[in-house]
Design a protein with these regions (language model features):
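Short cysteine-rich clusters marking metal-coordination/redox-active sites
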Residues: 187, 405, 477, 520-523, ...
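NTP-handling and nucleic-acid-processing catalytic cores
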Residues: 22-28, 146, 158-359, 431-463, ...
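Alpha-helical recognition segments enriched in aromatics with Gly/Pro capping
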Residues: 217, 308, 348-360, 466-468, ...
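Catalytic adenosine-cofactor/nucleotide-binding cores of aminoacyl-tRNA synthetases and other
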Residues: 404-408, 597-602, 606-684, 783-787, ...
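Acidic, turn-prone loop/beta-hairpin segments
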Residues: 95, 184, 188, 194-202, ...
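Conserved phosphate-binding loops in nucleotide/dinucleotide-binding enzymes
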Residues: 112, 202, 333-336, 376, ...
Length: 929
């Protein structure tokens, strides 16, 4: 007789090989065809809401690993919150205006932007953005992200643009919007102003110069020994091209400055920097004639070294930002080309010179010598001219971090221009209060970071000199130049945009856009022109909380969470906070979670030139999206997140182990009906009770990790549970019970009850992470008739506190530790060919003290627990026994006694007792009758 056929072997059609790249699209189709997203919403309608407001990615390219990480983190949270009973509407969005799209379309059309019809270019940009939205949407859906993909919010939609106009109008009516001349970040390549959030820093080699500024008014501070000699203040600058705009020299009032004789001249600079400057300029600056405090030189005067400027004076001013960290302690000041310079210029009523045009070329104001030169190309000519004039003390090249445009990657400049601003000072205090009192920051350091940024930031430059965006809704009187913006004009423009979108601004005249009968409040005339600038795209995305969350009925304001990369403290988190506080006085979000950047396996930034770029599409093609999701959950996103082929391969192995654990349980519960076959907990075998107790402990740990958004903690907890506690211990031990006991025996049903509960809870706990695989498992599981259609609809499993027993936990934890020592000795015996399988062994356990007590507590089941044929506990030590890692335990391994049962392979003296089955042990003989 073939006794193998009488065993209760696992049966399941759940595939061993995942085949995720091929199988996952089937589940995407299942979710879509069965409208799972909307069915989930209907099931939880009326429940408390958890609204995670999607930060809009930019619609201009394939998604990268950072996008994948971000969207999957959001999806994990939303799926968990749904299981916890929340209504979790998720509306994805896209950012669609701005320079990159405009640049791409101009390049595609092969024309100069000034040659293009505005509406033609805008139409091209519109189509470009929609094309990339479709591509990105498919990529995001392929990651398993569930959301309202058919009704996303898009910043170019008419209703969105209209609400953005209303947000701007509310801020303007509160007095928070103004036009003024200020130094702003300016990209000569893009020919537009930039916001602070649009700046990134990269290393750049720059010529720095030490310039002698002739001193013509010394406040009577020149030492007697210096009189009769030419005196110069020595300034230092890293931007020689800004010398034509110099109008002042800034000193620190509390620093000590020295008058130094050098080559027949007198130089004035910070005393503590004499040695450093002397070395850099190859000059002997040791002959100090006297010293003066900085404050005593206020309102002294130098003369600009360029003679064509007709002895233009440079005022000596005081500034606390002057330090001894670099330079000379005398700071070149050009208010038209620096933010702190500009503030100093206002304080001292200095002229704001900015002899640079929109393309970054020096104008006639800089002088005929430099006119038409690109700013950075002028550095060397300025340096040479100063040398000709005997005003160059020294020069050096330095490498330093310099600001670049994050769109075109070119270096930017500071340029004083007339721009529209949001007056952050008007609501800064309210914003800081909201940061401290209204928002949970995750990680906690995010609070201090954004607090510092908001407290130190300048007013927000919100105008851009482009056409692909939402226009600044301001009109100018053709007669007197007065600008016009009020509630009526804003509402009129908003209504036009609701009908036609922001194209209406260029398609209609000012008179058509304005309410009938509008006249200038200053002069009474009725002819107007429209503002030509558009809004900063950060104003677009910064308005989403009002234009989307506050408007869509399924959402709500303020939202529960914003979740983006840590760079958004100066980007979207901040722009949203500023518009929200300005309009409502409150933060738009209750919590903000930030993650780091994705880097390669060595912690380096991904770069095509380095060749270390990994894209999600390639991982999905080879391994499947669930591996990308597992990578996301396994990473501590608070720091930078590493990825490499090796890391992905390791995660695929972890996935395989988890899948195999689940497949084993599916196969061994195939003939089990929980409703009719389940064994009550108090009647279960103690080992099964232990397994369910550990399941409760796992649920506690996993729930806490989900609640604190520490997904890497739950990843490690579940991985350890599946591979160590289940596969290596519990499931290994109960295999004999599952296979060899009678199919409907209490012993077997007890184990199946435990496995069923473990599987049910594991599926729910893993479904936010391994969404595709858990959906697949759910379709294979035996379920009651009223079970939800999708795993995504299952409620979160409650912790059964009554299963938790500290005494039981201690007992089994102690045994597991001892078992590992015994298993090591068995492995040695197998290696030495004393035994083959562990069932070929009989073990004698020579124990004392604690080890003896632990072993005696499970003595009747000891052979089963050790997966050997016989186990004997002997009190006391024994000569020749194998030592273990414990002093109170030694082990002897010998061949098992008796004969091997043909069915269960356990050796026993009782094999053959049943004459009908002479090769079976009594248990197996009874099991097949």
């Amino acid at each position: 007789m073939d006794y193998g056929k009488t065993l209760n072997l696992p049966e399941t059609e759940f595939p061993m090989r995942a085949g995720l790249p091929q199988r996952e699209p089937e589940f995407l189709k299942f979710w879509q065809e069965n409208d799972i997203y909307n069915k989930k919403h209907e099931l939880h309608e009326g429940h408390p809401k958890f609204v995670l407001h999607d930060g809009p990615p930019y619609a201009n390219g394939k998604i990268h690993m950072g996008h994948a990480l971000n969207k999957i983190l959001k999806d994990i949270i939303m799926k968990y919150k749904y299981a916890q009973g929340f209504d979790t509407p998720y509306v994805p969005g896209w950012d669609t205006h701005g320079m990159p799209i405009e640049h791409a379309c101009i390049k595609e059309m092969g024309l100069n932007r000034n040659e293009l019809d505005v509406l033609t270019l805008r139409g091209k940009c519109h189509d470009f953005a929609l094309k990339w939205i479709d591509i990105q949407r498919d990529d995001f859906k392929r990651l398993g992200v569930l959301g309202d993909w058919d009704h996303p919010y898009v910043t170019l939609h008419h209703d969105f643009e209209a609400e953005q106009i209303r947000v701007f109008g509310t801020m303007a009516n509160k007095g928070y919007i103004y036009k003024g001349k200020k130094t702003v970040y300016w990209c000569p390549h893009c020919e537009t102003a930039l916001a602070e959030a649009e700046i990134e820093y990269g290393e750049q080699k720059t010529p720095t110069i030490f310039v002698k500024m002739p001193l013509v008014k010394d406040n009577g501070m020149t030492p007697e020994t210096a009189k009769g000699k030419k005196a110069y203040m020595v300034i230092w600058t890293t931007t020689p091209w800004t010398m034509p705009a110099n109008v002042a020299v800034a000193l620190n009032p509390n620093l000590e400055y020295a008058w130094v004789e050098c080559e027949g001249e007198v130089l004035f600079l910070a005393k503590d920097l004499l040695e450093t400057v002397g070395q850099k300029c190859h000059k002997d600056l040791s002959n100090i004639l006297g010293t003066t405090m900085g404050k005593d030189m206020e309102f002294a005067e130098c003369v600009h070294p360029f003679p064509e400027y007709n002895n233009r004076r440079s005022l000596v001013v005081m500034a606390d930002y002057v330090t001894l960290e670099a330079g000379t302690g005398c700071v070149h000041t050009a208010p038209g080309h620096g933010d702190v310079d500009f503030e100093t210029g206002l304080k001292y009523k200095l002229p704001i010179l900015c002899p640079v045009d929109a393309q970054g070329k020096l104008t006639a104001e800089a002088g005929e010598r430099f006119q038409g030169m690109f700013v950075f190309d002028a550095n060397i000519p300025v340096l040479k001219y100063l040398a000709e004039l005997n005003c160059l003390l020294g020069k050096e090249n330095i490498k330093h971090q310099y600001a670049h445009c994050w769109r075109c990657k070119n270096p930017i400049i500071f340029r004083a221009t007339s721009q529209w601003f949001a007056s952050v000072d008007g609501f800064r205090d309210d914003a800081l209060k909201a940061i401290a009192n209204d928002v949970q920051w995750i990680p906690a350091w995010g609070e201090q970071r954004i607090h510092n940024m908001v407290s130190e930031r300048h007013d927000w430059c919100i105008s851009r000199q482009r056409v692909w965006g939402v226009p600044i809704p301001v009109f100018y009187c053709e007669h007197c130049g007065e600008h016009l913006i009020n509630e009526e004009t804003i509402e009129s423009v908003a209504q036009w945009f609701e009908k036609e979108g922001s194209d209406a601004w260029w398609a209609h005249t000012a008179e058509e856009l304005l309410p009938a009968g509008t006249v200038c409040p200053k002069c009474g005339h009725n002819h107007f022109r429209k503002e030509s600038d558009i809004m900063d795209v950060w104003f677009d995305s910064g308005s989403t909380h009002m234009a989307v969350a506050a408007k869509r009925p399924e959402l709500g304001w303020p939202v529960s969470m914003y979740l983006e990369g840590s760079d958004q403290h100066r980007g979207w988190f901040q722009s949203s906070l500023l518009t929200s506080v300005a309009v409502t006085g409150k933060a738009p979000y209750k919590s903000v979670l930030t993650h780091g950047y994705v880097v390669d396996g060595e912690g380096r930034k991904m770069s095509k030139s380095v060749g270390n770029v990994i894209v999600p599409q390639d991982i999905i093609k080879q391994y499947g999206a669930d591996i990308v999701r597992l990578w996301t959950a396994s990473s501590d996103y608070k720091a930078d997140i590493r990825i490499s082929p090796k890391i992905i391969k390791q995660l695929s192995e972890v996935y395989r182990k988890i899948r195999n654990t689940i497949r084993y349980i599916l196969g061994n519960t195939n003939d089990f009906n929980y409703e009719t076959d389940a064994v009550p907990f108090n009647e279960m075998l103690e080992l099964d009770q232990w397994a369910l107790m550990h399941l409760q402990l796992l649920k506690k740990e996993v729930t806490a990790a989900y609640e604190s958004y520490d997904f890497h903690v739950l990843y490690h907890a579940i991985h350890n549970f599946c591979t160590v506690e289940m596969s290596s211990f519990y499931l290994d031990i109960i295999k004999d019970r599952l296979y060899a006991y009678k199919a409907d025996s209490k012993e077997r049903r007890s184990a199946q009850t435990a496995m069923h509960e473990i599987l049910m809870d594991l599926v729910v706990m893993l479904s936010p992470v391994l969404s595709f695989t858990m959906e697949e498992v759910w379709q294979f599981m035996k379920k009651p008739a009223n079970a939800p259609q999708s795993v995504q609809m299952l409620p979160w499993p409650a912790v059964k506190e009554e299963y938790i027993n500290e005494e039981l936990e201690t007992k089994w934890d102690n045994f597991i530790e001892i078992r590992s020592e015994i298993t090591k000795v068995l492995e040695l015996a197998r290696r030495d060919k004393k035994i083959g399988h562990s069932l070929d062994a009989k073990v004698e356990l020579h124990a004392e003290g604690e080890a003896l007590a632990i072993l005696q507590s499970v003595e009747k089941d000891l052979a089963t627990l050790l997966i050997v044929s016989q186990a004997v506990v002997v009190e006391g030590a024994a000569a020749g026994a194998e030592a273990t890692g414990r002093e109170d335990l030694k082990v002897t391994v010998q061949a098992a006694e008796g004969h091997k049962c043909e069915r269960c392979w356990i050796y026993s003296d009782e094999v053959g007792n049943d004459p009908e089955h002479p090769t079976l042990c009594p248990r197996c003989a009874a099991a097949i009758k």
